[in-house]
């Protein structure tokens, strides 16, 4: 699921909690009943694409990885646990590889707000040899919670 909730309604998807009052935050497009169609409470777990460019990892706004995850936590209202993560092969700055130093930052930005981390797409880890970068990111995270 794409974490860009402010525009995801355009494809007819309301992944938020039905307890979340969408119309209060998005009165330009959400009706008072839009919240009734949220389905987060029907899921066991959710993967949310926090797809942003290499220079949009940290921040509080919706359009960066950390912000996507922070917003998702608010929208899901505890109804379902979720993992957020980047697209490391198609988003701006990621398409040519060579961004290994950014991988630990993506893990930090997403996993510390969400309930987990995922990456799209595994093929890019192999293609750009990001294995050690992921290991460093997860090791850093595990060391931070001990």
List the predicted regions and their residue ranges:
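Substrate-binding cleft of secreted/luminal carbohydrate-active enzymes
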Residues: 34-146
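Aromatic-lined carbohydrate-recognition surfaces of secreted/lumenal glycan-active proteins
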Residues: 1-31, 78-91
């Amino acid at each position: 699921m794409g974490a860009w909730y402010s525009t995801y309604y355009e494809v007819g998807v309301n992944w938020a909690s039905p307890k979340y009052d969408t119309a209060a935050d998005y009165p330009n497009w959400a009706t008072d009943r839009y919240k009734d169609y949220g389905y987060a409470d029907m899921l066991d777990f959710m993967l949310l694409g926090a797809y942003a460019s290499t220079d949009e990892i940290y921040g509080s706004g919706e359009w960066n990885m950390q912000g996507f995850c922070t917003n998702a936590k608010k929208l899901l209202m505890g109804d379902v646990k979720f993992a957020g993560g980047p697209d490391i092969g198609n988003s701006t700055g990621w398409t040519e590889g060579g961004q290994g130093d950014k991988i630990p930052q993506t893990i930090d930005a997403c996993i510390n707000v969400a309930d987990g981390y995922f990456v799209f797409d595994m093929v890019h880890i192999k293609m750009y040899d990001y294995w050690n970068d992921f290991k460093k990111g997860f090791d850093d995270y595990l060391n931070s919670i001990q």
